[in-house]
């Protein structure tokens, strides 16, 4: 599912339910499969694009998935985000008979992510906050705006990101979602709605003044019209 849809929280809850049946989720952390920066794709502004699935070493992911499903041990890579390179350090991994591989990723539905795995061995789950709520003018609240506010608070709390940075970066996120995630929603086995109606009052209390300020700040800035439109809408 898209950014800030609740994938990690859902993963924890899913693992707890499966454990009651004697099964165990084993996460394949695809963040460790990023290409070294010199091999990394760039966007139209020359910035490194971490939002695209092509930023990942898809052949190696498939190689490891095939080996794991065949009962073999693999050496999982480790990506050092400080150096922008894959470390020489690796971690061994081998599946037990009661273990299920979980790919917790923005791009879990992207066909090339699991092209080596037979379809009958996959269960595809999509998650997004599908809130059915209208504003005072009768317009539905956009799901992408909910996720934007979630990510602002998460990035500020856990990554020391100023919410302004998250807003200015969001058009990259949204472009990748529309290109690499949304087209494959119709291939999933089930959809989870992670919307919580009580979210919006909390976000208003924490971010309401900021959105008003951003709308005024970027109103006449031709380079940040996406940020202005999102801030004005929220």
Regions found by a protein language model. Name each.
Residues 26-28, 35-84, 100:
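Conserved nucleotide-sensing/catalytic segment adjacent to the nucleotide-binding pocket
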Residues 26-29, 51, 101-103, 124-126, ...:
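Structured core elements
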Residues 6:
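Conserved glycine(s) of the Walker
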Residues 16-26:
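Post-Walker A helix-loop "phosphate-sensing" segment adjacent to the P-loop in P-loop NTPases
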């Amino acid at each position: 599912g898209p950014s800030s849809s609740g994938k990690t929280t859902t993963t924890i809850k899913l693992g707890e339910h499966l454990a009651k049946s004697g099964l165990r989720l084993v996460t394949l952390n695809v963040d460790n499969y990023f290409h070294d920066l010199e091999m990394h794709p760039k966007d139209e502004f020359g910035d490194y694009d971490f939002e695209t699935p092509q930023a990942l070493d898809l052949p190696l992911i498939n190689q490891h998935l095939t080996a794991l499903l065949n009962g073999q041990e693999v050496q999982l890579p480790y990506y050092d985000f400080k150096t922008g390179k894959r470390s020489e350090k690796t971690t061994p991994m081998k599946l037990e008979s009661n273990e299920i591989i979980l790919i917790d990723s923005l791009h879990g539905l992207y066909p090339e992510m699991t092209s080596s795995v037979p379809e009958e061995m996959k269960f595809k789950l999509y998650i997004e906050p599908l809130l059915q709520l209208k504003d005072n003018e009768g317009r539905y609240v956009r799901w992408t705006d909910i996720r934007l506010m979630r990510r602002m608070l998460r990035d500020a709390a856990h990554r020391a990101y100023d919410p302004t940075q998250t807003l200015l970066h969001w058009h990259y996120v949204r472009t990748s979602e529309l290109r690499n995630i949304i087209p494959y929603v119709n291939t999933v086995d089930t959809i989870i709605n992670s919307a919580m109606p009580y979210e919006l009052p909390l976000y208003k209390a924490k971010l309401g003044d900021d959105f008003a300020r951003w709308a005024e700040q970027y109103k006449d800035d031709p380079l940040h019209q996406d940020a202005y439109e999102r801030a004005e809408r929220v």
